[in-house]
Every structure is written in C-alpha cells, then in structure tokens.
Amino acid sequence: IPKYIRNCGEMNIEVLPPCVNKSMKKFSVEDGKIRFGLMGVKNVGENAIDAIIKAREEKGVPRDIFTFIEQLDISQINKKAIESLIKAGACSCLAENKAALLDVYEGLVESAQNASRKNLAGQMSLFDIGGEEAAESLSAKLPEITPFSKDVSLAMEKEMLGVYITDHPLKDYAEKMRKVASITSEELNHAGENQEMDENSLAQGSLGQGSLDQSGADSASRIKDGMKAVMAGMVSSKRTLITKSNKMMAFIALEDLYGVSEVVV
C-alpha cells in the first residue's frame, strides 16, 4: 500500500484518509481523489462499517462525536472499534482533536449501550429513552484538552492503518536522507525478491525473466549480494533475543519514505 500511495502522489492523485462521514467499505473515488476505505482500519469489522454507513444514509451525516454515536446501532459496534477509528483519523470530520475524542468516547458508548438495553423494542432513540441525563450527555461539548503532537498523531495513524496517509514523520528529513543513503527500502526489498525468484527459477530449470517490474529489475542489476550499502530511516520496531552462543541479537524494522526493511544486528 505505501508504494501505491506514493505512486498516486507521483501522478498527482491525492489519497484521502478514512472518514466515517465519507468512506465506504473499500477504497473509493471522490472528486478525482482516492478515499481510504473503512475496512482498512484495524479492529473495525464489517458489521460495524455497515452500521456506520446505514446510520449516515438513514439519519444524515453526523455533525459531531455525540451525534455520531447516538445515531449508531450500538449493538453492532464496540468501544475498540470507535477508539481505532479515532486514532486512524476517521473521526477528524467530527472534531480534529483526537485527544478530546478519546477522552469522551467510552462514556458515550456506555450511555448508548445502557439506553439500548432499556429499549427492549429497539425503536426509540437514546434521547427518547434516556431522558434529560442522556440528552445532556450527547449535547455536551468536547473537553478542552491539549491536542496530541504531530508525531503522536501520525504514530496512531500508522498503528491503525499500517501506513501513513496524512503525512510522514521523515518527510522533513527527506533531503538529508537522500544525501547520505545509497539505497532505499524499496530497492532493497526488490533485490531480495529478485534473488529469491532467480533461485526458484534455477531450481525449476527456467530463468523466469519478465516477472519483475522495471524498478525491481533496475534494483537487482545495481545491488549485489554482499555489497555495502547505506539506508537512512527510523526504527519502527525492534525484537531482541539471545543466541545459542549467549550473544545479543536484534531484528530491527528500519523504515524510510519508501517502505520497511528488516535489519539484523
């Protein structure tokens, strides 16, 4: 997905983040742009997505987090899904402050669940059956909380989507990285795929040419096994272990603007 998003950028096609008011289940076209689908958000199942789309189609596009949760069939969506949508930025159309949204969503979901349990017939709204207490809860204002920093917000986006959409934490360092790096993660990964493909082809008695795209072929011709290379990026994850010889070893996910490569140290 990161490669496709970058390719869209090179073709001046903007990829929009997921949005509870506009996204469909899968990727969709919106005014010549591509909108990220809700199925791409971690912890959000198909039933929850159906409930979100049905609510906005039948009851109108919600104006805030209070209306959003009030309109939902709360039996089809849980707290984890709402939390993931907020972290992914899919609720930014309701309020831009993720910290404030995360502060109130649990209480709103619990109120909606309590109201739903009281509503045995399943016909009345939360306002109808919850009285003044529910009405006050859903008409309240978001608390004044300091917004998350850009890096924290982007980290949440990456965690929930598996990719950066709105920005990239390394974007400001792109020029410096180009000056010191001799290889990108995309080139390195292509070279590895090409080597594995060649080995499989030789074992099967064929070369298997033409199966890689041009960028992969170019990378394979430039990168050779055993050569030294410099890759610039940030450590997105790390896993350490002790070898049989009692030495420390680590597997590091090194991420740049083009993807992720595993590094062993």
Model-derived features: positions:
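Noncatalytic, beta-rich nucleic-acid-contacting surfaces in large DNA/RNA-processing enzymes
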Residues: I1-V265
